[in-house]
Amino acid sequence: MGKIRVGLIFGGQSSEHEVSLQSARNILQAIDGERFEVSLIGVDKQGRWHASQASNFLLNADDPGRIALRESGENLALVPGECSGQLQTAANAHPLAQIDVAFPIVHGTLGEDGSLQGLLRMANIPFVGAGVLGSAVCMDKDVAKRLLRDAGLKVAPFVSLTRSKAAGADLSAIVEQLGLPLFVKPANQGSSVGVSKVKREADLRAALDEAFRYDHKVLVEQAVIGREIECAVLGNERPRASGCGEIVLSDEFYAYDTKYLNEDGARVAVPADIPDEACQRIRGIAIEAFQALECSGMARVDVFLTPDGEVVINELNTLPGFTNISMYPKLWQAAGMSYRELITALIELALEKGRMDEALSRSCQY
């Protein structure tokens, strides 16, 4: 049996482009070369797909602050239909590699929000991670929190605002409703991009303006006092949860720079130094949230553990980072699963989901 052909898709047009490059580099280094043959598909900031080479697809690869995609002169196109998984040159339709399964690691908008997943679904290519619905729901913090709340899971009180609603909003009433401090964040962004912590009502308008730079909808959320705990979930219909890890901050909050550029801004503690009973509750809640939001493949579930032991869900990330300091792979490594085994498990789950989709009837019989 030949090797399974994996299309590793990375980069993208979002503000998390550079994070995706770091993740792709680590996945490429960890993947089992005896089982998988990798085609690198780099997406530049204009949305063009490039055929990348493993030996030189990154510039400044060892510097998270300057890492960049080396754009090839050969743009790619994806052929759907009977030639499912066929890559070809965009200029002259010259056939290149054909892929059996895609591993999208394009973080943020147009990669993690169901857009790329929809393209792969239409092209009939199995892919790692959540499907169209789960990806879109988890990306939209407003919709995700409403569904979690309806499922009986605890989330922080919040208000969602569009730009037009925010223009005429009574900010004093919002502060009175939610209290201070507040967090203001774009509804459809990850990696803490555009997030502000507001301690004074006078700063709320500026925080809204900053968040609206990145999205048309913004969340104003009550700050939760508690420890930041993360749990990794892996699986399709029978998901399992890892142990718990903790983000121990030295900065004000877990901002973009703290996550990816300043390794001294936070410390990742795996396992988290919390009571076993609390960790078991968090693991159960993580699986409930994973299923409530129609996730599959993988997700990192971020929660707060308050001083009185309450678990408040912050968010679910359906394409968690695979950078050097990312929590998702660290949690599974602590559970005894190596980086390589994790990558293999994710690809196998994608193929399993693809077989289930393929078995569905696509015609009406009377």
From Swiss-Prot:
Coiled coil: none
Keywords linked to the UniProt accession: ATP-binding, Cell shape, Cell wall biogenesis/degradation, Cytoplasm, Ligase, Magnesium, Manganese, Metal-binding, Nucleotide-binding, Peptidoglycan synthesis
Entry keyword annotation includes Nucleotide-binding: yes
UniProt cross-references to InterPro entries, sorted A to Z: ATP-grasp, ATP_grasp_subdomain_1, D-Ala_lig_Van_CS, D_ala_D_ala, Dala_Dala_lig_C, Dala_Dala_lig_N, PreATP-grasp_dom_sf
Listed pathway(s): Cell wall biogenesis; peptidoglycan biosynthesis
Binding-site positions, Mg(2+) 2: E315, N317
Keyword Repeat: no
Binding residues annotated for ATP, in chain numbering: 175-230
Job description of the protein: Cell wall formation.
Protein name as it appears in the record: D-alanine--D-alanine ligase A
Organism of provenance: Chromobacterium violaceum (strain ATCC 12472 / DSM 30191 / JCM 1249 / CCUG 213 / NBRC 12614 / NCIMB 9131 / NCTC 9757 / MK)
